[in-house]
């Protein structure tokens, strides 16, 4: 599906699939849980899912003649960390807009974790007080204009790389990679669980798994707390990506499976249940998830198993997208573990 698209390699190769045997047993042993470790995909600044997307965006950035990558996210954005890492790797400058997406007041929130790593890698980081929104942001457009005005050649990468024209391609590749691994494993996964916010990870998976009829087996766990906007953006990106890769069929709103039950209380703020899911996964599997994204999708998967959403004998693949560096910004919440 992706053969005709240029890809700039930023990852080690196919990410490993790990059986979560102790977590599965703890939850009753009727459902087999596995994790695809996107959090271990690269040596670039702790890796994560955004690198899969950026592999298909970097060739376009280089071809454009740009000298500065310009992107946006929250203060503890994993995406902006990855953009900073990629800029360093390919020899470009980086301008980052970090908006106040999360009403979180840990004393060191804007000085540790992802934002600290971006600064270490040389990004020009600007803090902006605007609140959360997954759409196109005026602060980002202003940053692009400022780079131009200073004589630079900006290349614009939206939040999460999601509404970029190539933003969905990387996770079409994820689906193709899973199919190859399934042949080696000798079975196919019945469900894929993924955290959904800006939408292109879910959308790319939806398109990729639509090739073998599993588009509605991709279970998005909303962490945006703005599910209507997120659902619409996933569908828009999926349709555009399907056209790009010649999927050959129309995708409908019903193809976007998005569970809205675990994003509370608000984007970026973990509930008691999210924190307990983070602890449970860490203590049973040594697998670290974060309070913003993966903790909520882990909470969702655990709860769905407990409620019997997955039938007995189902094999469920949890897409671990990364994000652990953000935990540093939540030190007080986990001060006792």
UniProtKB/Swiss-Prot annotation:
GO terms for biological process: 1-aminocyclopropane-1-carboxylate metabolic process; amine catabolic process. Belongs to the ACC deaminase/D-cysteine desulfhydrase family. Keywords: Hydrolase, Pyridoxal phosphate. It catalyses: 1-aminocyclopropane-1-carboxylate + H2O = 2-oxobutanoate + NH4(+). Catalyzes a cyclopropane ring-opening reaction, the irreversible conversion of 1-aminocyclopropane-1-carboxylate (ACC) to ammonia and alpha-ketobutyrate. Allows growth on ACC as a nitrogen source. Pfam families: PALP (PF00291). It comes from the Bacteria. GO terms for molecular function: 1-aminocyclopropane-1-carboxylate deaminase activity; D-cysteine desulfhydrase activity; pyridoxal phosphate binding. The modification N6-(pyridoxal phosphate)lysine is found at residue 50. The keyword Isomerase does not apply. It is an enzyme of class 3 (hydrolase). Its EC number is 3.5.99.7. Coiled coil: none annotated. This is 1-aminocyclopropane-1-carboxylate deaminase. The keyword Acyltransferase does not apply. Homotrimer. The active site is at 77 (nucleophile). Its cofactor is pyridoxal 5'-phosphate. It comes from Methylobacterium sp. (strain 4-46). InterPro entries: ACCD_DCysDesulf, ACP_carboxylate_deaminase, ACP_carboxylate_deaminase_bac, TrpB-like_PALP, TrpB-like_PALP_sf.
């Amino acid at each position: 599906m992706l053969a005709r698209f240029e890809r700039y390699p930023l990852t080690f190769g196919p990410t490993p699939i790990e059986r979560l045997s102790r977590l599965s047993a703890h939850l009753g042993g009727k459902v087999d849980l596995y994790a695809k470790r996107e959090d271990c995909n690269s040596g670039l600044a702790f890796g994560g899912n955004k690198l899969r997307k950026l592999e298909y965006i970097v060739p376009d950035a280089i071809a454009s003649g740009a000298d500065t990558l310009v992107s946006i996210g929250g203060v503890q954005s994993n995406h902006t960390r990855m953009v900073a890492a990629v800029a360093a790797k390919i020899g470009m400058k980086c301008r980052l807009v970090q908006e106040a997406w999360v009403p979180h007041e840990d004393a060191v929130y804007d000085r540790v974790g992802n934002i600290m790593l971006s600064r270490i890698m040389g990004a020009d980081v600007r803090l902006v007080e605007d609140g959360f929104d997954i759409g196109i942001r005026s602060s980002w457009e202003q940053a692009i204009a400022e780079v131009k005005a200073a004589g630079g050649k900006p290349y614009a990468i939206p939040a999460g790389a999601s509404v970029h024209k190539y933003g969905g391609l990387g996770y079409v590749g994820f689906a193709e990679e899973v199919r190859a691994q399934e042949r080696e494993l000798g079975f196919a996964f019945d469900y894929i669980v993924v955290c959904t916010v800006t939408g292109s990870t879910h959308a790319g998976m939806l398109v990729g798994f639509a090739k073998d009829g599993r588009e509605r087996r991709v279970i998005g766990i909303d962490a945006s707390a703005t599910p209507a906007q997120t659902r619409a953006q996933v569908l828009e990106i999926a349709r555009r990506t399907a056209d790009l890769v010649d999927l050959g069929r129309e995708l409908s709103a019903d193809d976007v499976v998005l569970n809205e039950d675990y994003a509370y209380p608000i984007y970026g703020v973990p509930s008691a249940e999210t924190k307990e899911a983070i602890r449970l996964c860490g203590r049973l599997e040594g697998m670290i998830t974060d309070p913003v994204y993966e903790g909520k999708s882990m909470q969702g998967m655990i709860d769905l198993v407990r409620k019997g959403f997955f039938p007995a004998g189902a094999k469920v693949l949890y897409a671990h997208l990364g994000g652990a560096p953000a935990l540093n910004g939540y030190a007080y919440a986990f001060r006792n573990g």
